[in-house]
Regions:
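Glycine-rich cofactor phosphate-binding loops and adjacent beta1-alpha1 units
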Residues: 2-85
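Conserved beta-strand scaffold positions in the cores of enzyme catalytic domains, especially
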Residues: 12, 85-87, 116, 120
């Protein structure tokens, strides 16, 4: 959470200290979020997905980019009426323009990826990198595989 604040977040919500759904509802005066990006991996996935749906306001979008354990995600019809749930992160037209914009933000220095990189692995150690991300998601923020070390 401290890194999010250091990188310019207007408000940081620590789900270990407060109910994230209630916090988002309070911040939006009860109307809910326009966009929730679900980028959670590992065993927290299904619960975070449910919370993401609960944070959405009418006509809001939940964008799924995280991977989780092989459990079905609950999609109650009452929670998805007048809301959008988008899955995927590559290969869609909107995805390509998003990548282009992300590269522009990185190149201009508006996004400091170096601060968000917590671990670097040689590509030959990719199994260890994925183990860290999957089994210890709270210990890593950004993990890079390097080919030219």
């Amino acid at each position: 959470c401290q890194m999010a604040a250091d990188l310019g977040a207007d408000r940081v919500i620590n789900a270990a200290e407060e109910d994230p759904v209630a916090a988002v509802r309070k911040l939006t005066n009860g109307s809910g979020a326009h966009l929730v990006v679900y980028a959670v991996g590992g065993p927290a996935g299904p619960r975070a997905f449910e919370q993401g749906l609960d944070m959405l306001g009418v006509d809001g979008t939940l964008h799924l980019v995280g991977l989780y354990e092989d459990e079905p995600l609950s999609l109650p019809s009452s929670k998805i009426q007048r809301r959008r749930v988008l899955g995927g992160y590559y290969g869609q037209r909107i995805g390509l323009s998003s990548y282009r914009r992300a590269m522009q933000l990185l190149a201009s220095g508006q996004v400091n990826a170096e601060r968000m990189t917590t671990h670097r692995f040689d590509y030959t150690e990719s199994a260890a990198a994925f183990d860290l991300l999957w089994n210890h998601p709270g210990d890593a923020l950004g993990v890079l595989l390097e080919w030219d070390r």
